[in-house]
Amino acid sequence: MSTILESLPTGQKVGIAFSGGLDTSAALHWMKLKGAVPYAYTANLGQPDEDDYDAIPKRAIEYGAAGARLIDCRAQLVAEGIAALQSGAFHITTAGVTYFNTTPIGRAVTGTMLVAAMKEDGVNIWGDGSTYKGNDIERFYRYGLLVNPDLKIYKPWLDQTFIDELGGRAEMSEFMNQAGFAYKMSAEKAYSTDSNLLGATHEAKDLESLESGIKIVNPIMGVAFWRDDVKIAAEEVTVRFEAGQPVALNGVEYKDPVELLLEANRIGGRHGLGMSDQIENRIIEAKSRGIYEAPGLALLYIAYERLVTGIHNEDTIEQYRENGRRLGRLLYQGRWFDPQAIMLRETAQRWVARAITGEVKIELRRGNDYSILSTKSPNLTYQPERLSMEKVASTFSPRDRIGQLTMRNLDITDTRDKLRVYSQVGLLTPGESSALPQIKGDSDK
């Protein structure tokens, strides 16, 4: 039996993820007029461009909602964001600049917490504003059904009747004005923006063209660091972790992780830290492009990664990075709470993050330009005296190294033999400019 409803279920409770914007406002009022019983659920995700959350449920009631609730998701959002940081769950990078999966994390929190609230109210039909070409339609589908197996999905933007009547923003604005709500359509931007406390996503419209760059974006969490008229002074900041948890910035301890991340956003935002321009693969395998902001997570990640490399050994770090990339993809695909994701995440939190205690001092400049100034931790396995070039007491002698190098003769000989075989069968045909050695066997001499 299909869980997708293609037409409006009249006479039934329908929950809608309500942002208060034009799209969801028009959809809610339209559903009311068509005979459904709409309930509005608004997630407080600490969006930097939203300054009055309390007014949103009131507007929903005004537009015809039978009930409206504001769900504070900030603590859970930050908890999941820190869990992603601890496990390195970030798979999208360009030349070392990372996208911190802030929208997928937000969808995991929104999808589960709003549907849980709906379930409490006896609402088993859910709608939201995601389109059929994007990632969110699948993310919300998965998270919603995880929480409520009886959930049905109704999306006005998949209902042809709704599309025929209110297919564009101009039509929706006129519809709301005719209903007496004097709804003023906001100015059309050159791109769309979605944000939460962890970060912001700018995409679509003009940004779909790769000829348009980051310079057309007006940052909402930081500064346009690429502009010459934006003055940015270098700033030193210290970040302290205890057992994998960020606990202090510039010596100030924060008991509330939300407040710590807000301050990290302010610090990083002053420099435009954490902005990136990425080409990525959506869940349906089509490529898309986004410009992202995440100043606070970027700041914490610099310090966390520095401590990871100073505390853990090479094989542990390699496993952490490989698992992190796999986990990042699962998170992106809406599988953050799937068993395989939980296994990868908790492994990193237990065996990597728990040892991360220490303090890192960083100098921030413009954009992602920074320097690490100092690293302190009681758990460091970095011991400079072991490899010092000065004359100090050493853990091994020159004779020990001679023995170690002599043992390498075995695999060097094996490598030489393999290269010779590859050359004989035509797999290797190095020319004069090749860095590969001209391998010859005894019979070739």
UniProtKB/Swiss-Prot annotation:
Keyword Cell wall biogenesis/degradation: no
GO cellular component: cytoplasm
GO BP field: argininosuccinate metabolic process; L-arginine biosynthetic process; urea cycle
Binding site residues for ATP: 17-25, 43, 129, 131, 136, 194
Gene3D superfamilies listed in its UniProt record: 1.10.287.400, Argininosuccinate synthetase, chain A, domain 2, HUPs
Chief location of this protein within or outside the cell: cytoplasm
UniProt record similarity statement: Belongs to the argininosuccinate synthase family. Type 2 subfamily.
Record-given protein name: Argininosuccinate synthase
Provenance organism: Burkholderia ambifaria (strain ATCC BAA-244 / DSM 16087 / CCUG 44356 / LMG 19182 / AMMD)
